[in-house]
Every structure is written in structure tokens, then in C-alpha cells.
């Protein structure tokens, strides 16, 4: 009886860990399916629409980042929550996978963040210079390339510093504490600076939309349609920013607490780390829902793709 009672809490913790991992993996699977759908919708639109606009390409870029993020973190959810981070594959092959895994984990989040900033810059150009095409298709592809290159350069030192660390019989893929603190602080700075830039850009966009004067040769109907489209996109992008930072804030709080040496305050809160991970994973689920809610054309195209028909109207114009 004594042995049974001693093993009961262990069994309960194991069951709880499996339940948490299952929930996280389910959320990531939904995120994967939704973002694949987004890419398919935009691909159909890109092939058939005469307006291959930058918004659609940037949204597709966010979805691609979310797809990679989901694929990478589905096994991670089980590894972190059930195996306590124990890295099963070791040796030279395991070491290479460890370095690649940590490298990709940094890239996907920063890429999504920089792409949202790129959309803000694009919308600023559209609103302030409606008759000039400043961001061409070629420029757009170059910006997308930069949204992957900049995070890759930031994460490049991981290939050197990532290694196996053994503690209490568990081998994890990680960085030394001091290196981790530097990366966490750098990541926080990137998110803060991009947020600050987006706030300035969208404040300027909102001010311009509020006091905009259209040329006399634009009809009332065309003016109303343009205003409505700009307002819808403006609201959608603001919601994207709020969702990204709301979902990232808990994990960012954990990382900063570690970098600033008060991590113990949060580590003692039993479920905080799980909630932080779940919130982070939910962002990939929320983004496609935002596209559907705020964009009628995208909503229509989703229905047509699901019914195996083609969408021929421009999305995110």
C-alpha cells in the first residue's frame, strides 16, 4: 500500500503531462492544417488573379513560417512536457539535429514578426502614396528574403553554441546559461523595436486615413470602396499585431525573467510554463481565423478551395 501511495503522485503527474502534451500537439496540428489552407488559397489567387499584391505574399510568408513552426514543435510538445526535454537522438547525428532545431526555433518567430512589420510599411506606402507603386513585386520578394535572412543571421551563433547538456540523468539540447540570457535579451529587443516601429507606422496610417482628401476625379463610390477596403485591412493588421504579442508575451516574460535572474518566481508557478507554451502555439491557429473574419474575399476563397473550386478574385488587395 505504501508503494502504491508513493507512486500515485508520480502517475498523476505523468497523466497530466500527457494531457498537456496532447492539447499542445492538437493545437499545433490545427495550426498546421489552417496555414496550409491559407497558402493553398493564396496560391490559387496568385495564379489566377491579375493583382498579385504584396499583402497576399506577406500573409503567405507568415503562414509558411507558422507551418515550419508547427512541424518543428509538434514533437517538441511531447519532448518538453512528457520527457522533460530529454533529447533521445544523440551522437553526431543528434548534435546536428540539436543545432538545426534550435536555429529554426529562433527563425520562425522572428520571421513572422518582421513580416508583420513589412506589411505595416507596405500599408503606409499604399495609404500615403495611393497613385504610386513603391513596393513592386520584385521589391516584395526581396523584403520576404530579408525576413528570413535577418533572423538567420541573428540565430547563426546557435550552430556554435548549441550543445547537449546533461543534468540528473536527462540530456537536453540547449545553450549555456550566459549564452541563453544574451539570446533571450536580443530576442526581446527585436520584438520591442518592431512593436515600437509598428505603433509609429500605424499611428501615421490611422492619422492619414482620418484626414485623407481624395482627388476630385475619384467618384464617391470608388472613394467609399477604397476607404472600406483600407479600414478592413487596417483593422485586420492591428488584430494580427495584438494577437502576435498577446500570444508571445507569456513566453517572452519567462525568457526575460531568466535573462534578468528572477526566473525562480515563475518556475515555482506550476502551470505558468505550460500556459506560456500553449499561448505561443495558439498564435498559428488565430492568424488564419483573423484573415477569415476580416477579409470577405479570403473567406469566399476558403469556401471555394474547400469545395474544390477555384477562386479568381483578388485577396488582401
Question: Which residue ranges define each predicted feature?
Answer:
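Intrinsically disordered regulatory tails of 7TM GPCRs
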Residues: 1-11, 49, 211-235, 296-317
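Extracellular N-terminal segment of 7TM GPCRs
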Residues: 1-41
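Extracellular TM2-ECL1-early TM3 structural module of rhodopsin-like
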Residues: 16-25, 54-118, 126-129, 133
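Intracellular effector-coupling site of seven-transmembrane GPCRs
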Residues: 56-65, 207-251
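Seventh transmembrane helix
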Residues: 198, 245-246, 252-256, 273-317
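Loop architecture of class A 7-transmembrane GPCRs
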Residues: 2-11, 83-107, 129, 140, ...
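Hydrophobic alpha-helical segments of membrane proteins
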Residues: 36, 67-78, 153-156, 160, ...
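Cytoplasm-facing ends of alpha-helical transmembrane segments in multi-pass membrane proteins
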Residues: 32-44, 70-77, 106-130, 144, ...
Amino acid at each position: 500500500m505504501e508503494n502504491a501511495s508513493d507512486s500515485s503522485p508520480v502517475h498523476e503527474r505523468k497523466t497530466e503531462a500527457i494531457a498537456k502534451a496532447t492539447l499542445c500537439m492538437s493545437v499545433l496540428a490545427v495550426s498546421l492544417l489552417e496555414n496550409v489552407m491559407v497558402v493553398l488559397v493564396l496560391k490559387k489567387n496568385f495564379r489566377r488573379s491579375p493583382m498579385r499584391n504584396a499583402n497576399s505574399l506577406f500573409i503567405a510568408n507568415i503562414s509558411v513560417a507558422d507551418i515550419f513552426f508547427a512541424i518543428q514543435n509538434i514533437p517538441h510538445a511531447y519532448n518538453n512536457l512528457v520527457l522533460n526535454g530529454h533529447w533521445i537522438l544523440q551522437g553526431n547525428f543528434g548534435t546536428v539535429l540539436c543545432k538545426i532545431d534550435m536555429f529554426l526555433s529562433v527563425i520562425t518567430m522572428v520571421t513572422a514578426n518582421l513580416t508583420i512589420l513589412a506589411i505595416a510599411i507596405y500599408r503606409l506606402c499604399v495609404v500615403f502614396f495611393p497613385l504610386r507603386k513603391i513596393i513592386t513585386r520584385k521589391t516584395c520578394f526581396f523584403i520576404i528574403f530579408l525576413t528570413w535572412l535577418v533572423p538567420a543571421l541573428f540565430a547563426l551563433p546557435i550552430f556554435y553554441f548549441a550543445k547537449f547538456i546533461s543534468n540528473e540523468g536527462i540530456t537536453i539540447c540547449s545553450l549555456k546559461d550566459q549564452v541563453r540570457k544574451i539570446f533571450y535579451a536580443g530576442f526581446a529587443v527585436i520584438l520591442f523595436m518592431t512593436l515600437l516601429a509598428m505603433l509609429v507606422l500605424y499611428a501615421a496610417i490611422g492619422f492619414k486615413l482620418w484626414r485623407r482628401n481624395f482627388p476630385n476625379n475619384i467618384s464617391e463610390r470608388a472613394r467609399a470602396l477604397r476607404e472600406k477596403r483600407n479600414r478592413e485591412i487596417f483593422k485586420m493588421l492591428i488584430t494580427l499585431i495584438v494577437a502576435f504579442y498577446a500570444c508571445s508575451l507569456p513566453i517572452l516574460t519567462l525568457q526575460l525573467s531568466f535573462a534578468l535572474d528572477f526566473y525562480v518566481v515563475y518556475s515555482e508557478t506550476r502551470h505558468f510554463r505550460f500556459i506560456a507554451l500553449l499561448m505561443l502555439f495558439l498564435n498559428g491557429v488565430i492568424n488564419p481565423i483573423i484573415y477569415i473574419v476580416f477579409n470577405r474575399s479570403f473567406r469566399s476563397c476558403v469556401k471555394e478551395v474547400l469545395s474544390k473550386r477555384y477562386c479568381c478574385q483578388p485577396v488582401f488587395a
